[in-house]
Curated annotation (Swiss-Prot):
The lineage of its organism: Bacteria, Pseudomonadati, Pseudomonadota, Gammaproteobacteria, Alteromonadales. Coiled coil: none annotated. GTP binds at D56, V57, R58, N59. Displays ATPase and GTPase activities. This is Nucleotide-binding protein Shew185_0683. Signal peptide: none annotated. ATP binds at G8, R9, S10, G11, S12, G13, K14, S15. Disulfide bonds: none annotated.
Length: 284
């Protein structure tokens, strides 16, 4: 089992790192007391091989010897990776002032500046024990996300899931679409009596549409558009992309185009799915 522990000063980016881990398939738990790690791993054994927890100052032991003992008591098959995120006092003070959030130690009747300094002192033992120390003072959320992915995967690229979904406009537009293309202007197999009862998944319909230069040109242009912008979407920490293709009824043209696009992009590094809303609804 792989375990990632994310610690650090409040406001340094622990939540950002945890979101990256969640996107990578980790089962994430925020602010788990260290003595409960063993119990958590035992509960998840066999069902989750990737686990990540974040630990803040409220859950840290006061002595570093206790911390070392707790980490040493992890199950022997645990592959541990640890991060400590830090920022300068000035940057942390600025971030808290901008977000107006309450610092975890502010309840002790101390000022924000004093709470930030106190937290740094309390977390110092942890900062010396971790595998990866990241100063986020000059990093934005995208830079930090890239660093975490680089450490865990050896690459800043994330696996983007692309869903090509066909639909019929007369049944309503999908609300989850990131891109939406209207193919109602393409030649319609519906007017061919032999093709009318078939769908875009059937070979006769596919052959009919494949013979249409306008159809092939449109598919090629969508493919080029997506290939141009996919790297930028990935850099923007996007995990899912839904491309909706709509025709009148969602039976012929949109199904064929969605299938063709899914085939073309399935040869790359992305996870690609084709979903046909109206066909699925007809089966239900």
């Amino acid at each position: 089992m792989k375990l990632v522990i994310v610690s650090g000063r409040s406001g340094s980016g622990k939540s950002v790192a945890l979101r990256v881990l969640e996107d990578l398939g980790y089962y994430c738990v925020d602010n788990l007391p260290l003595p409960l790690i063993g119990t958590l791993l035992e509960q998840l054994k066999g069902s989750n091989d990737l686990v990540a927890i974040s630990v803040d100052v409220r859950n840290m032991p006061e002595q570093d010897k206790v911390l070392v003992k707790q980490l040493a008591s992890l199950p022997p098959d645990t592959e541990l990776t640890s991060f400590f995120l830090n920022s300068s006092d000035k940057i942390l003070l600025k971030r808290y002032s901008e977000t107006r959030r309450l610092h975890p130690l502010s309840k002790s009747q101390v000022s924000l500046q004093e709470a930030i300094k106190l937290e740094g002192k309390l977390l110092e033992p942890m900062s010396k024990l971790v595998d990866h120390y990241i100063d986020t003072s000059n990093l934005n959320i995208y830079d930090l996300s890239d660093q975490v992915r680089q450490i865990l995967l050896g690459s800043v690229d994330k696996e983007l899931v692309i869903n090509f979904e066909s639909f019929g406009f007369k049944h309503g537009m999908p609300t989850e679409a990131d891109f939406m293309f209207d193919v109602r202007f393409l030649p319609n197999p519906h007017w061919e009596l032999a093709l009318r009862p078939l769908t875009g998944l059937d070979e006769p319909v596919a052959e009919f549409l494949n013979r249409q230069p306008l159809v092939n040109k449109f598919i090629w242009q969508i493919e080029n558009l997506l290939e141009t912008w996919l790297p930028h979407l990935e850099r923007n920490n996007r995990s899912y992309l839904t491309v909706a293709i709509g025709c009148t009824g969602g039976q012929h043209r949109s199904v064929y185009v969605a299938e063709q696009l899914a085939k073309r992009f399935s040869n790359g590094k992305h996870k690609v799915y084709a979903r046909h809303r109206e066909l699925n609804n007809a089966k239900a």
